[in-house]
């Protein structure tokens, strides 16, 4: 799977 960083808490 690929993990996509976003501004909703994944960073």
Curated annotation (Swiss-Prot):
Arranged from A to Z, the UniProt key words for this protein are:
ATP-binding, Nucleotide-binding, Stress response
Q: Does the keyword Metal-binding apply?
A: no
- A single GO molecular function term of this UniProt record: ATP binding
Q: Does the UniProt entry include the keyword Nucleotide-binding?
A: yes
Question: What additional remark is attached to this entry?
Answer: On the 2D-gel the determined pI of this protein (spot N164) is: 5.4, its MW is: 73 kDa.
Protein family per UniProt: Belongs to the heat shock protein 70 family.
What name appears for this protein in its UniProt entry? Heat shock 70 kDa protein
Q: Which organism is it from?
A: Pinus pinaster
